[in-house]
Structure formats: C-alpha cells, structure tokens
From Swiss-Prot:
Binding site for a divalent metal cation 1: 12, 14, 48
Disulfide bonds: none
Any one GO molecular function term: 5'-nucleotidase activity
Protein name, UniProt field: Uncharacterized metallophosphoesterase YunD
Protein family according to the UniProt entry: Belongs to the metallophosphoesterase superfamily.
InterPro entries for this protein: 5'-Nucleotdase_C, 5'-Nucleotdase_C_sf, 5_nucleotidase/apyrase, Metallo-depent_PP-like, Pesterase_YunD
Keywords: Coiled coil, Hydrolase, Metal-binding
CDD domains recorded: MPP_UshA_N_like (cd00845)
GO biological process, one term: nucleotide catabolic process
Cofactor: a divalent metal cation
One Pfam family linked to the record: 5_nucleotid_C
Length: 462
C-alpha cells in the first residue's frame, strides 16, 4: 500500500525572528491539511536556529529559541555551530534542559567522553503504518574551538558510519540531520549510500528541488527563515520500502498568514530581554564616536582592549565591527549589544615582521576598507579602516591617488623582517580569504567564551 510521509525542515534561522510567525502559521496549516488526508507530517530544525546577534537570544543564551521550537512541537533538531561554539560551556550544557523534542547529535561529548545530558546519537520514530525511521544527527567539527570551550567534537563521517551500524536493523528509512555544509554532505552521500535523505544546512544553500547524490536526496532551505523545506516520501508499507522521494521549498515571502500567538510571545520575550540587558556596565562623560573610514574612538578603544586582554605586542581591529556610537551617560549591556552584536571572539596569532607588514598593507587598501562582508560571524556592513594598538602605521596618499603604507614602527623602531610578533585579532580574520597570512598562522590561541562586546564592557569599566 502506497502512503505519503512529509518531512518539513528549517535551517539556519540565525534568530531572524521576523520570519518565524509565518513559518509557524505555514507548518500548522500544512499539518492540518495532511492530517485530514490521513498523512503523517514530521518537523525538524537542522541547527543555527539561534544567533546571539539578536538581543532576545543574547539575553536568554538561546533558551527563547528552544521555547519557540517547543511551541512549534517539532519532532527533532540538530545543533549548529551557533549553538555549539557561541555559548559558554555551562550555557550549552543547559540549553536543551527543557526541550520537548530529541536533540540529535552523535559527534559531541564533554571532556570525560560523555554526551551532553540532552543529546542522543539517533532517534527512531515509529510511523502509524508500522514502518520506522531512524534520524541521525551531526554537527560541523570545529576542533580547536570546541576544545577551548571544554567539549570534544569528533569526525562527523566516522560518527555517521558508527551510528548507521547501530540503526541499520531497526529502521526502514534513514534520514540524516546534518549541520556540515553542502560539500561535506555530498561526500557523506557518496560514502554512506544507506542514508535515504540528508536534511542539510550550514552553508545556506537553497536546493529548490533537492539534489540527488549517489541515490541520496539532499534538501536545504537556505537561511534566515526565508524558506521552509519539505521532503515528500512515498512508501510501500507492505514491502517496507521507499517508492519515491522529492524535495521542495516554500518561499515565506509568498506566505501571507502569521501566527498571532507567536508574535505576542516574541513581543513579550523582547520586553523581558530589554529589561534583563538594562544593567549599566559603565558611565561615559561624553559621547564616544565611530567612523568606519577613518580612525575613531570606539574602534581604537576596542583595539587597546584586545591587546590588553590577549597580552600581545600588537592588536588590529576593523572599524566596521563597531556599528554605532555611544551617548554620554550610562552604558548598558543592551547598548553594547546594539553597537557590537557579532558572535566574534578574540584570537592571538604569531606573525613575522614580514607577514605583519604584508597584512597591514593589505588591510590599508581601498578594496579591503570598502569590502562588504557576509558571514564569518560578522553582523555588520563593511570592513572599514583597520586601527591598531601597539604599532604605529604611517600612510600617505601619493600621486597615483592610492594610500600607501610608508612606515610601520613598534615603540619607535621599524619592525624587523624575521622577528616574531604576537598579534591580537578578531576570529573572523582567521577564517576564509580575508587575511591569508593570519588564517594560515601556525600558532593561534582562541580566547573564549568572551565576545568583543565583553571586552568593550571590561575596558569601559576600567
């Protein structure tokens, strides 16, 4: 007998709550439709639901996000890197204490080799027709960062293979909730064809009709709640097999309904968060300014805080990381979150004088200062002018109309080509293609769990 099963999935919401009332309304409507047709519906979130750029998430350390998932009555969730590495250890350990759904992640452990109390390596769901589905889950293994936060994360592919051996005889269908990114998910599909469907995330791909790799269906719904994905599986309950599987997405911009209850809940959470973040951390005698394309007070203050916190020779901060000024008077946690919402940590690296000079020259180029940045934890608009503490950078605009770095000195002396210098930077400089010499530095020390705004609060309070 042929029957239909639907898996609705969200991924990488990043606390863009403006779309959540639509998502709730859409899924609730679809549940009712399928229920009236006698068809089963399951709902999953594939991680990075939370993002501390949003002040409600900041104030609750993500517990408001879990409340939203509870209220939607989802059937399971994976965790993303925003859940995994942007929360202090004790906050992640307690994040899902009140979750009313299984949190499925097989490759995360504490330092004693135990899973978090809320984690399961897989979840088996029995369907009304007698068939069963095994749901597996993995998260992207940022090894040094998890280690710094007191966790152990293991190789995702090996973990999947181990879990497959456990569930193979227990389930008719195998679905992987993966927060690895599309390239890794394609590799998983090639290596583990026993998987029927991968609900994927992390790299924010929109797979409007899914993608089939080695017989495995990959499905992903982009980011920020712009879309909700749906995998439709037609099964033969007598043969206990899959007849067909397809993927589609619903654009939330085209969905007009909204959940009034969800909007009211979010409004209440915003009021609570504003009150919780209203504590003053410092008092300013006068306004503190920021200018993205010239040296200004707040980025410089952060540069000095970074150098002092990391105990380095030098620090470098892009002015665009500060999103606005601070007014004279009390400075609250909410004020600092408003001007520096990024989930970005300090990092200390070691560079030779030659590498440092090349990096500074690169940062001073108009192309870098004007660069629009997306991702890497950055929640602003533009890179902006690089400012420094501990090193003096002299520049001059020459006849070619380009600003050139003419001299770099440390304590009045030219930096030495082969000497090693410790440099405090933003962790986003160690990722991607922004600063290859920083990214490829052999020595890196991450300072966690503090974010840049925590360093600003510490420095302002001095």
């Amino acid at each position: 007998m042929k029957e239909k099963l639907r898996l609705y999935h969200t991924n990488d919401l990043h606390s863009h709550f403006e779309n959540w009332p639509k998502i709730v309304d859409y899924i609730e409507q679809k549940r009712k439709e399928h229920q009236s047709d006698g068809e089963e519906t399951l709902v999953f979130d594939i991680g990075d639901h939370l993002d501390r750029f949003q002040f409600v998430t900041e104030a609750t350390f993500g517990k408001a996000n879990v409340d939203l998932l509870n209220r939607l009555h989802i059937d399971g969730a994976a965790i993303g890197n925003n859940e995994g590495i942007t929360l202090p250890h004790e906050e992640l350990a307690a994040l899902y204490d009140h979750a009313e759904f299984p949190v499925i992640v097989s490759n995360l452990f504490d330092k004693n080799g135990n899973r978090p109390s809320w984690a399961v390596p897989y979840h088996i769901k029995s369907l009304k027709n007698g068939m069963s589905i095994a749901f597996l889950g993995v998260t992207v293994p940022y090894y040094p960062v998890y280690d710094k936060l007191g966790w152990t994360v293991t190789d995702a592919l090996e973990s999947i293979k181990e879990t497959i051996l456990e569930v193979k005889g227990q389930a008719d269908i195998i679905v992987l909730l993966s927060h690895l990114g599309i390239l890794d998910d394609q590799a998983v599909a090639e290596a583990v064809p026993e998987i029927d469907v991968i609900l994927e995330s992390h790299t924010h791909h929109l797979l409007e009709d899914g993608q089939v790799v080695n017989g495995v269906l990959l499905a992903s719904a982009e980011k920020y709640g712009h879309y909700v994905g749906c995998v439709e599986i037609t099964v033969d309950s007598v043969q206990r097999s899959i007849n067909s599987k397809t993927a589609s997405v619903q654009n939330m911009a085209e969905w007009t309904g909204e959940s009034a209850e969800t909007k009211a809940f979010l409004n209440e959470k915003e009021r609570e968060a504003e009150e919780k973040l209203s504590d003053a951390v410092a008092e300013l005698a006068q306004d503190a300014e920021v200018k993205w394309f010239e040296e200004s007070e707040l980025p410089l203050l952060l540069a000095y805080a970074l150098k002092e916190w990391c105990e380095t020779d030098i620090s470098m901060v892009n002015s665009g990381v500060i999103l606005g000024p601070l007014k004279a008077g009390p400075v609250t946690k909410l004020d600092l979150h408003r001007i520096c919402p990024h989930p970005i940590n300090p990092v200390a690296v070691r560079l030779t004088g030659e590498e440092l000079k090349e990096t500074i020259v690169h940062a001073a180029s108009e192309q870098m200062e004007q660069l629009r940045i997306k991702g890497l934890g950055f929640r602003g608009e533009v890179m902006g002018k690089m400012v420094y503490a501990g090193v003096e950078v002299e520049t001059k605009r020459l006849d070619d109309g380009i600003t050139h770095v003419t001299r770099i000195t440390l304590n009045g002396e030219d930096i030495e080509k082969h000497k090693q210098y410790s440099v405090a930077v933003l962790d986003m400089f160690t990722l991607g293609k922004l600063f290859p010499l920083i990214r490829d530095a052999a020595e890196k020390e991450y300072f966690m769990p503090e974010f840049l705004r925590d360093l600003l609060a510490w420095k302002l309070a001095q």
